[in-house]
A protein has these predicted regions:
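Alpha-helical transmembrane segments and their short interhelical loops
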Residues: 39-116, 158-170, 174-178
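Residue-level recognition of specific faces of alpha-helices
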Residues: 16-19, 31, 41, 103-109, ...
């Protein structure tokens, strides 16, 4: 279930990025720019409404996993809470793509590569510990393995080990969010 949740959340990147790129090329965003909102307000307006969608995806993933034997317990609730920072990671990536690329086709192309990279670099297909070495170090330098591990640890109710992985996920979300605001602001002025 943790890998399914991270895989599902990775699709939020394409959704948010495509929505942003489409809005930027339409008159909808031009009308919004006449309001006294700041760039960060627009970015938050794309981010916050997607969080309930991420939670619904998580609930659907757990419902499917329960069909295959996952038991409902407090860890399930913790994992849904951990899904919020994981979703913020992928939402911030979508914001970055939507701000950087001018068409939804470009966002979709790059986003599809990102979804596939997430699957392989998070250990969803094959545990990265089995491969080890440089590949494991590379995966651990990226947020995807930490996202899957955070959900896995939350599900196991190992909250002490969870914090380091959540730190990595939130750090990357922040690192993707800041340039999104800057690029969006620059593109809207130009």
């Amino acid at each position: 279930a943790p890998s399914m949740m991270v895989f599902g959340a990775s699709w939020l990147t394409i959704f948010v990025g495509s929505l942003m790129a489409t809005d930027r090329n339409s008159s909808f965003l031009m009308r919004l720019l006449s309001t006294p909102l700041r760039s960060v307000d627009y970015i938050l307006g794309y981010s916050i409404p997607v969080l309930p969608l991420a939670l619904l995806q998580g609930i659907a993933s757990f419902a499917t996993a329960m069909i295959f034997g996952l038991s409902l317990n407090l860890g399930t609730f913790y994992a849904l809470l951990v899904l919020i920072p994981v979703a913020l990671l992928f939402i911030s990536l979508g914001l970055l793509l939507g701000s950087a690329f001018s068409s939804s086709n470009a966002v979709s192309g790059f986003g599809t590569i990102l979804v596939n990279a997430t699957v392989f670099l998070s250990g969803a297909v094959l545990p990265i510990e089995m491969i080890g070495g440089g590949f494991e170090a590379f995966c651990n330098a990226l947020p995807f393995a930490h996202a899957a591990k955070a959900v896995q640890l939350a599900l196991a109710q190992d909250l002490n080990s969870l914090l380091l992985h959540l730190f990595w996920v939130l750090l990357y979300a922040f690192l993707f969010f800041i340039p999104s605001v800057w690029i969006f602001k620059k593109r809207m002025k130009g």
